[in-house]
Amino acid sequence: MKAALTGRAWRTPLGSGIDEVVDRLLAGERAAQPNARFDARSYACTLAATIAAPPAPSRHARFLRRMGLYAVEVAAEAMRDAGVAGGDRVGLFFGYGGLRAHWDDLMPAFEHQRADGHGAWERGLALLHPFWILQHLSNNAHAIAAQELGARGEGATYGGANAGAQALAGAIRALAAGAVDVALVVGYDSLVEPETLVELAARGSAVSNALAAPYDMAAQGFVPGEAAAALVLQGSGTARAFIQALDGADGEKGEPQPALFGRLVGAIARPGDAVDGCGLALPSFDAAERRVVADITGVDAPLCCIMSAMGQIGAATSVVQAIALAELLQRQCMPPLAGLREAAPGPLRPILRAEATTHRSAIGLSASAPGLAGIVRVELP
């Protein structure tokens, strides 16, 4: 099953404009820098790739945190870009990283509490925002975007590191079944949070201070990033590209096993596809990923990595990949693997500098703990 991509928008560590971000990808830029969100000197990972521009002022800031505000912004922009309006046949499919009780909210509220709960309100609970529970509803951004845009059709909210792929796959199925005529898909996530950095360090997933690219001989972990992206899918009409997507899970506590990637890649990838890799920068995983993908695409398929430029962006990954790969294929250019110095041996051909391409299709892969994976395939009309 595939659907026509007709509108798109994003907020990324490389910028907010489509052309701006694609130009920076082709220039081989990396957004990684010392954490600009908060003082991270006491964390194992001090680097981050963050969105520079703040969300626009919004009355919804009472109910939405920063990333949720970006999500509502890009949803509206993608609808305008596609030239479509809300209605009963417009569905909304949201993917986000999952519920997180943020430490900056909870620590002031609980650091002076007693074991018996005596005086809990005076000891800190009064410091919680009165809308704290409402701010942590899983479908907050979905509900507000649906109200703002008049999207009254079928839809769903998905959670987890591969929620963007889940949302894309769900939207494409809804279009194929005739449940909606237009599907707005939004993915948003930030790995640049104190609680997330602690978890990534415990898993050994995030880089410390020595920055090396994925698929590099010196790779030793990824840079945490963040993004919000939205695209509009339709069953017919003038398409920028056609999109397919799948998600999967294998129950692993850490990164998914190669067998899961084999199933996903075997289901929708084709010989001759260009490849945008997961970019986890974990040598054993990177090597296994390349072998599994090359079995389908061929050993000489070009390998780029948008996440090397932007950092790992969790639930937003597949949506960002779909937008970026569509733009790159239309330009007939593929970006270099940002930051790559010495490519590790293996199948697939890491792209060292921006190059012209005649490829008309590409796949984008994503993976994260616990055992979650996604794939998106983009094909020009």
What feature does the model see in each segment?
Residues 151-152, 157-226, 231-233:
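Internal metal/ion-chelating core segments
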Residues 187, 279, 366:
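Residues that line or immediately flank small-molecule/substrate-binding pockets and catalytic motifs
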Residues 4-5, 26-149, 154, 191, ...:
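Conserved beta-ketoacyl condensing-enzyme motif
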Residues 2-11, 18-35, 40, 206-277, ...:
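Condensing-enzyme catalytic core mediating Claisen C-C bond formation in acyl metabolism
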Residues 81-95, 108-130, 147-154, 177-184, ...:
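Structural signature of cysteine-dependent C-C bond-forming condensing enzymes
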Residues 10, 57-76, 98, 133-134, ...:
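Active-site pocket-shaping loop/turn-to-helix segments
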Residues 99, 190-196, 248-256, 340-358:
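Short, mixed-charge aromatic SLiMs
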